[in-house]
Amino acid sequence: MWTADEIAQLCYAHYNVRLPKQGKPEPNREWTLLAAVVKIQASANQACDIPEKEVQVTKEVVSMGTGTKCIGQSKMRESGDILNDSHAEIIARRSFQRYLLHQLHLAAVLKEDSIFVPGTQRGLWRLRPDLSFVFFSSHTPCGDASIIPMLEFEEQPCCPVIRSWANNSPVQETENLEDSKDKRNCEDPASPVAKKMRLGTPARSLSNCVAHHGTQESGPVKPDVSSSDLTKEEPDAANGIASGSFRVVDVYRTGAKCVPGETGDLREPGAAYHQVGLLRVKPGRGDRTCSMSCSDKMARWNVLGCQGALLMHFLEKPIYLSAVVIGKCPYSQEAMRRALTGRCEETLVLPRGFGVQELEIQQSGLLFEQSRCAVHRKRGDSPGRLVPCGAAISWSAVPQQPLDVTANGFPQGTTKKEIGSPRARSRISKVELFRSFQKLLSSIADDEQPDSIRVTKKLDTYQEYKDAASAYQEAWGALRRIQPFASWIRNPPDYHQFK
């Protein structure tokens, strides 16, 4: 079928060949994050009895995004012409929506070959049965999936994170991290303390690299587990991992902050810093953001699909991801599963076509060459700070203007005087995707339009079109009735009233 390394290599090659120099990190000074959606197509005329692993497929990158930034709440605009969230995963998903709009235009308007085939109801389309989509990210999503234990070992290979840690509250900190000096040393990739630690990843040791730790302050809540000396009960012989005792000495931290008003992090030293399973918002520089963490958004996609409310008007079923592949980085299989699928497992009554997906989650052993870890290793003792790249790149598999490079939510190079004009809009901003949706709708004869639009009273604003996707809104309402999703931060209505 495909392997995690094949997906990663395809995305890295696409980044190097198809994306321009503009918007990429400055060598040896900046780093960025990468995400993409890969279309998987099973080859035709294969025997039905071929084992799944031997099925021949073609792989194609259909959307890609880079980026590390979010704007604060004070910079949000009611006109929908700014990107609030420019993390790579979100850029890739919005670029994917642009690709889906183009494919719907091919099918519904031009009657040309497309990823969609007619559905059973008038005006609706469904994904071809030989196609699926894999989501790739060079790193674990910010938020819950990035709360990963660091394990200290004596003379034993790298062990996977045990299920009990990943699914419950953090374990107690160990004595050697009580001292604040040692704690700071753990956050320094070059320190002796940090080099003693190895991540609990199933088969691979990640050396000389630690995740970027958050800067949240500590708070006085005790952890649930009374001892940091744990015994691995599930040795993974297939990966050559021996059983034995180990200690969780700290956690890789996420900068994403808990939703205001909800139970917060423990904030104790070492491994007791974070609570797991909570909704989080992305951090801002002094100005709080309204953007939920990538872990939370990806969990939502796994129930509602990646297409969003607008495109659901044209679809018989949501467009789900079949798998998520993560590049080489601090990683925990159990934390990923908890964050993306485990929090949605409570029984949900969902509309027809919607459901909690059994998402396949894998990690590649290939490191993204412009990741923070790779650039830090390459630059050695070079002077100056290593900083995240301020630009974001969007690429979609569409024939016209596939590239979009932004900074601070606007096309790179936009002047203050230009803000508010059409030229100052990203092609994947809310207002531009809405324009593409309206163009698609106006190109379809009235008697061929979907019932959700045809029989509804006159629709005008972005919010009205979203609300008219009744099945999608019903599914979203069902998800928000369970914890932790009841705490989801929603933008005020004024931000969705543009036309």
Curated annotation (Swiss-Prot):
* Catalytic reaction annotation: adenosine(37) in tRNA(Ala) + H2O + H(+) = inosine(37) in tRNA(Ala) + NH4(+)
Molecular function, one GO term? RNA binding
Q: List the disulfide bonds.
A: none
What enzyme class is recorded for this protein?
Answer: hydrolase
Keywords, in A-Z order: Hydrolase, Metal-binding, Phosphoprotein, tRNA processing, Zinc
Q: Where does 1D-myo-inositol hexakisphosphate bind?
A: 93-94, 297, 300, 430, 466
Question: Could you tell me what this protein is called?
Answer: tRNA-specific adenosine deaminase 1
Which taxonomic lineage does the organism of this UniProt entry have?
A: Eukaryota, Metazoa, Chordata, Craniata, Vertebrata
